[in-house]
Design a protein with these regions (language model features):
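Active-site histidine-anchored catalytic micro-motif
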Residues: 2-231, 237-244
Length: 244
């Protein structure tokens, strides 16, 4: 693990950069200046060079889409090609775990670390966790971090493909779900690597539940989806007695 020296910071919006408006808190641009001002106010700020970019427009992460994930992927690959050796992605917490998982697979075999963070309260709000999370993530990258996608939140490093948001009322909102591994790492085929062009997919996800009817499933399949992912019960089973 090599210390990151030339960081790319990608700001997507989210709570961390929200500002008060007459309609309440809203995603806002201009976070680079706020970040620089805060780091300059620290006596022991992380010592690494960084370049800042904003996803346009800044998002409330509840509005995250596949297209946004592809834009993030393109920006990160371009940053790698421009000589950056690490990425810090600032993201809203509602869908941060989804984006971390998506990027984990969109960026398979990426040779640099990608760290996602955000906050439960906006930067500058009383008692906010924003600057602690951001500066903590910078310190992790400065000290050296393995390649791949991970989440830094509330002093914890979490695997990007196994993180879930479990709470909305506390700073320790995220946890890494356990998954035993019994296999060895294998080379990533070129068709799955981060250089492979991607496109949006009309995908639906359906968790199974008691009372689900075949007509519900048929209506979803007839809606024009390209693929349907079924979230089955724990052992992979589902209802089978609907004669429709």
């Amino acid at each position: 693990m090599l210390p990151v020296k030339n960081l790319f910071v990608l700001y997507t919006g989210g709570t961390i950069g929200m500002l008060q408006t007459p309609q309440g808190l809203a995603p806002a641009g201009g976070f680079e200046a706020r970040m620089r001002d805060h780091l300059q106010s620290l006596g022991d700020a992380p010592d690494l060079r960084w370049r800042f970019a904003e996803l346009q427009p800044p998002l409330d992460s509840a509005n995250m889409t596949q297209g946004n994930w592809l834009a993030m992927r393109d920006a990160i690959v371009a940053a790698l090609d421009a000589g950056h050796d690490g990425v810090l992605l600032l993201h809203g917490t509602d869908t941060l775990a989804y984006s971390a998982a998506a990027l984990s697979f969109l960026l398979l075999d990426l040779p640099i670390p990608v760290l996602l963070t955000g906050s439960m309260l906006p930067a500058g709000a009383p008692g906010s966790d924003a600057w602690d999370n951001l500066v903590g993530a910078l310190r992790v990258l400065q000290e050296g971090h393995a390649r791949g996608v991970q989440v830094y939140f509330n002093d914890a490093l979490l695997h990007g493909a196994r993180v879930s948001k479990l709470r909305s009322d506390a700073f320790d909102a995220f946890a890494e779900l356990p998954r035993p591994r019994h296999a060895e790492h294998a080379p990533v085929p070129a068709a799955l690597g981060y250089r492979q062009p991607r496109r949006e997919v009309n995908l639906a996800v359906l968790p199974l539940y008691p009372g689900l009817r075949a007509a519900h499933l048929r209506g979803l399949l007839d809606s024009g989806v390209e693929a349907l992912l079924l979230e089955c019960y724990g052992s992979g089973t589902g209802p089978s007695d609907d004669e429709e």
